[in-house]
Amino acid sequence: MKKKIVVYIAASLDGYIARENGEIDWLESVEGEGDNGYEAFYQTCDAVVMGKATYDHVLKLTSNFPYHDKKCYVFSRSAQGKDQYVEFINESLASFLNNLNQDTKKIWLVGGADILADFLKAKRVDEFIISVIPVLLGGGIPLFKQGIPEMNLKLTDIKQYGQIAQLYYEK
């Protein structure tokens, strides 16, 4: 069975996932409902993948690593081996996915924009769950970088959590 790769992420209404400096403080400015469906989604995932900058940012945000109960992989050009939380990946995306344990069926691609662009260029994203935050940032780190391939998607669901619209798309 093919591994399903899901992007589950929040973005501003104008398409940014963070300010230019990487800050995501604006996420707290909007009222949602509970955890906005996060825990239900998280429990369906077998593994978590992110880029090194996202990993560093997660470590800065909290003293308790939030993904400690899942296999967690961090793509990095510099870090190697493992630390207490993650395994660093220096190999190609295709090689990484081929070498993953057969039991790994659903992978959450946390971000950021660079690793997302790599997965999109390799045509390896199967589903998007985007929580649209009703904030206009006017600039920052875009969810989708220029140069990604065109991709037609199908809207499969829309959920509302307070002021947050969560959009579900599949390829």
List where the protein language model places each region:
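Enzymes that bind and transform nitrogen-containing heteroaromatic metabolites
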Residues: 1-171
